[in-house]
Amino acid sequence: INAVRYAFLELGVDDGIIVARTDSLGAGLTKQIAITNEEGDLGDQYNSFLDVEEISSENMNHGDVMISQNGKVVRPKRLPSNLYQFRKDTGEARCILDSITSLQNGADLIWIETEKPHIGQIAGMMDEIKKVVPNAKLVYNNSPSFNWTLSFRQQVFDSMSESGEDISSYERDDLMNEKYDDTDLAKKADDSIRSFQADASKEAGIFHHLITLPTYHTAALSTDNLAKEYFGSEGMLGYVANVQRKEIREGIACVKHQNMSGSDMGDDHKEYFAGDAALKAAGKDNTMNQF
């Protein structure tokens, strides 16, 4: 964070924004043990999340790494990969500490990576962060890595179960199944997904919502659908009806793909340099004029 701030100063960037992203909430390994000089300092707080076991000189092995923690000699659990393991269920606490530390040391916004889109979970962490940094602002990734349908259906299922509603017609682990699409549970889940951004901003203090990689998925899905139609019963109509016709009627500029690739710009330059002798790509007979 200090390096980024220094770069802003060197480059004369007066309105640069630093977003500090935590490790994923579900991440359970680390490659390092923090330096600590006294009990309770930042390094000591970080090390407190390590999965350790108390040892003595009798059960100490060659090459073991040991630290002093709370007056005891402990051995952090080290995997064959040489990574150290965090204690189970410390993810939220680690993200909270990471976020507070980042904000106190120059970050403008924090970005917490959760393992599911759950407003209550996000709000709980932000409440803890704001106890120390009241004006903390969160960037949240509405990630395609989440199974949004299953997650929200399970959240509705759990809520119905807690309130004593009849859930006998649902199987929690199978809620992604199409057979549930028209059920009240699925409709409630979709309503929650629809209002997720507004609800999360209001209830969990999310300052900015982003979504990573959506066009990767839309490109893959549309290409798959086109291939099925073009090489299936629809033939060329699969492209015309579901792509080109929609481009024209919805005013998508890419329908003139020659223009979007710069053909007009190229022709202008050719004409400027060669005049009437210019060999231009466009002209009255160019297919682009059909659009």
Model-derived segments and their meaning:
Residues I1-L210, T223, S263-F291:
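Alpha/beta enzyme core
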Residues T149, H217-T218:
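A SIS-like phosphosugar-recognition module
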Residues I211-T215:
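Short acidic/histidine-rich active-site segments
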Residues A220-M236:
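C-terminal helical cap(s) of enzyme catalytic domains, especially alpha/beta-barrels
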Residues F231, G251-I252:
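HKD (HxKxxxxD) catalytic microenvironment of the phospholipase D
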Residues Y239-Q244:
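Long, low-complexity, intrinsically disordered extramembrane tails
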Residues I252-D264:
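TerminUS-proximal long segments
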